[in-house]
């Protein structure tokens, strides 16, 4: 891989400093292009980049995955947060090894399923309803003052089941 986008959560401590250091290291290793972005993944395609490296936490990686869904671009997360469950590097000492592997194409892409959820009320989609993309799960819950909600669950347009509950969590396997 030679063309990288660093997608940075600037609210994380030392994020700018880390992004600049990683950019410099990738260029030293032979990267042809390393851009830094912190706002949006809109318009980013596989024509421009070979890989997106997120700097933040799991939330940053999930936000990038949602924005890049369908692009075919691989994501590699560097954890600057607390959990780092989805990231490939959580400690400063791990970052050089990860960058080397990316430059040398010495890695395995783990395909992750994403969910697309939509809420339909009383058989009709209202203008305020939209689709949500999720990497892990979609949580739908009632308003705090309301009673239980009646959920009819469909998967790919086929009825699955119905539930009466305070909320429901639909997750990837």
Show the residue positions of the predicted features.
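ATP/NTP phosphate-donor binding region
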Residues: 1-51, 55, 91-108, 119-132
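Short glycine-/acidic-enriched loop or helix-start segments at secondary-structure transitions
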Residues: 16, 63-65, 86-87, 150
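N-terminal glycine-rich "phosphate-gripper" loop used for MgATP/nucleotide binding
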Residues: 54-58, 66-67
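Short glycine-rich anion-binding loops that position phosphate/pyrophosphate groups of nucleotides
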Residues: 58-60, 83
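Short glycine/serine/threonine-rich phosphate/pyrophosphate-binding segments
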Residues: 60-64, 172
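Proline-centered loop/turn at the N-terminus of a beta-strand
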Residues: 72-74
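Divalent-cation-assisted or electrostatically stabilized phosphate/pyrophosphate-binding catalytic cores
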Residues: 79
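Catalytic core of DAGKc-family lipid kinases
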Residues: 83-167
């Amino acid at each position: 891989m030679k063309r990288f986008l660093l997608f940075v959560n600037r609210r994380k401590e030392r994020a700018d400093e880390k992004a600049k250091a990683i950019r410099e290291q990738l260029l030293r290793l032979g990267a042809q292009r390393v851009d830094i972005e912190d706002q949006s993944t809109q318009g980013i395609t596989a024509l421009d980049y070979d890989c997106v490296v997120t700097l933040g936490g799991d939330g940053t990686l999930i936000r990038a995955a949602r924005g890049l869904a369908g692009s075919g671009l691989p994501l590699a997360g560097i954890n600057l947060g607390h959990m780092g469950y989805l990231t490939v590097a959580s400690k400063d000492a791990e970052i050089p090894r990860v960058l080397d592997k990316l430059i040398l194409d010495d890695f395995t892409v783990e395909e992750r399923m994403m969910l697309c959820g939509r809420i339909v009320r009383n058989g009709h989609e209202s203008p305020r309803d939209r689709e949500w993309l999720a990497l892990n799960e979609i949580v739908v819950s009632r308003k705090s003052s309301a009673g239980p909600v009646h959920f009819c669950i469909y998967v790919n347009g086929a009825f699955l089941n119905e539930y009466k509950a305070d909320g429901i969590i639909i997750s990837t396997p």
